[in-house]
Amino acid sequence: MTQEEKTRIEERIVEILKTVFDPEIPVNIYELGLIYKIDLADDGALDIDMTFTAPNCPAADFIMEDVRTKVESVEGVSSANVNLVFEPEWDKSMMTEEARVELGFE
Protein backbone atom coordinates (compact mmCIF):
# COMPACT_ATOMS: atom_id res chain seq x y z
CA MET A 1 0.00 0.00 0.00
CA THR A 2 1.38 3.41 -0.93
CA GLN A 3 1.55 6.27 1.56
CA GLU A 4 -1.15 8.05 -0.44
CA GLU A 5 -3.47 5.03 -0.20
CA LYS A 6 -2.74 4.70 3.52
CA THR A 7 -3.54 8.37 4.10
CA ARG A 8 -6.81 8.05 2.17
CA ILE A 9 -7.85 4.98 4.17
CA GLU A 10 -6.92 6.64 7.49
CA GLU A 11 -9.02 9.69 6.53
CA ARG A 12 -11.96 7.38 5.80
CA ILE A 13 -11.44 5.65 9.17
CA VAL A 14 -11.68 9.03 10.92
CA GLU A 15 -14.86 9.84 8.95
CA ILE A 16 -16.36 6.53 10.08
CA LEU A 17 -15.32 7.07 13.71
CA LYS A 18 -17.20 10.36 13.63
CA THR A 19 -20.41 8.32 13.15
CA VAL A 20 -19.96 6.49 16.48
CA PHE A 21 -21.65 8.02 19.51
CA ASP A 22 -21.93 7.24 23.20
CA PRO A 23 -25.74 7.04 23.59
CA GLU A 24 -25.53 9.39 26.59
CA ILE A 25 -23.45 12.12 24.89
CA PRO A 26 -24.49 14.07 21.75
CA VAL A 27 -20.91 14.28 20.39
CA ASN A 28 -19.10 11.58 18.41
CA ILE A 29 -16.28 9.62 20.04
CA TYR A 30 -13.59 11.07 17.77
CA GLU A 31 -14.38 14.68 18.66
CA LEU A 32 -14.74 13.69 22.32
CA GLY A 33 -11.08 12.69 22.17
CA LEU A 34 -11.73 9.04 22.97
CA ILE A 35 -9.55 7.76 20.10
CA TYR A 36 -5.90 7.73 21.18
CA LYS A 37 -4.27 5.83 18.31
CA ILE A 38 -5.08 4.76 14.76
CA ASP A 39 -2.34 2.50 13.36
CA LEU A 40 -2.87 1.05 9.89
CA ALA A 41 -0.32 -1.53 8.73
CA ASP A 42 0.61 -1.95 5.08
CA ASP A 43 -1.38 -5.21 4.97
CA GLY A 44 -4.56 -3.41 6.11
CA ALA A 45 -4.47 -4.61 9.72
CA LEU A 46 -5.78 -1.81 11.91
CA ASP A 47 -5.05 -1.18 15.58
CA ILE A 48 -7.09 1.41 17.45
CA ASP A 49 -6.51 2.47 21.04
CA MET A 50 -9.50 4.13 22.61
CA THR A 51 -10.87 5.03 26.01
CA PHE A 52 -14.10 6.18 27.62
CA THR A 53 -15.03 9.25 29.60
CA ALA A 54 -15.44 6.99 32.64
CA PRO A 55 -14.02 3.49 33.28
CA ASN A 56 -17.49 2.12 34.10
CA CYS A 57 -19.20 3.34 30.92
CA PRO A 58 -22.44 1.31 30.66
CA ALA A 59 -22.33 1.42 26.84
CA ALA A 60 -18.67 0.31 26.53
CA ASP A 61 -19.32 -3.05 24.84
CA PHE A 62 -21.83 -1.54 22.42
CA ILE A 63 -19.49 1.33 21.47
CA MET A 64 -16.43 -0.88 20.99
CA GLU A 65 -18.38 -3.30 18.79
CA ASP A 66 -19.77 -0.37 16.78
CA VAL A 67 -16.22 0.93 16.26
CA ARG A 68 -14.88 -2.47 15.19
CA THR A 69 -17.77 -3.21 12.83
CA LYS A 70 -17.66 0.20 11.18
CA VAL A 71 -13.89 0.42 10.67
CA GLU A 72 -13.77 -3.13 9.30
CA SER A 73 -16.21 -1.97 6.60
CA VAL A 74 -13.69 0.58 5.30
CA GLU A 75 -12.18 -0.52 1.99
CA GLY A 76 -8.51 -1.30 2.58
CA VAL A 77 -8.94 -2.45 6.19
CA SER A 78 -8.39 -6.21 6.39
CA SER A 79 -8.95 -6.56 10.15
CA ALA A 80 -9.47 -4.33 13.16
CA ASN A 81 -8.24 -4.70 16.71
CA VAL A 82 -9.86 -2.22 19.11
CA ASN A 83 -7.96 -1.86 22.39
CA LEU A 84 -9.50 -0.29 25.47
CA VAL A 85 -6.94 1.76 27.40
CA PHE A 86 -7.20 4.07 30.39
CA GLU A 87 -3.75 5.67 30.21
CA PRO A 88 -3.64 8.54 29.85
CA GLU A 89 -6.86 9.13 31.71
CA TRP A 90 -9.39 11.00 29.59
CA ASP A 91 -10.25 14.58 30.50
CA LYS A 92 -12.22 17.43 28.91
CA SER A 93 -9.09 18.99 27.38
CA MET A 94 -8.95 16.07 24.91
CA MET A 95 -12.17 17.17 23.21
CA THR A 96 -12.15 19.28 20.07
CA GLU A 97 -13.22 22.89 20.46
CA GLU A 98 -16.48 22.06 18.66
CA ALA A 99 -17.23 19.29 21.16
CA ARG A 100 -16.54 21.56 24.14
CA VAL A 101 -18.90 24.19 22.70
CA GLU A 102 -21.59 21.58 21.94
CA LEU A 103 -21.43 20.30 25.51
CA GLY A 104 -21.37 23.77 27.06
CA PHE A 105 -17.79 23.75 28.34
CA GLU A 106 -16.87 26.94 26.43
Residue ranges and their predicted role:
Residues M1-E106:
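Domain-level signature for proteins that mediate thiol-based redox and metal-cofactor handling
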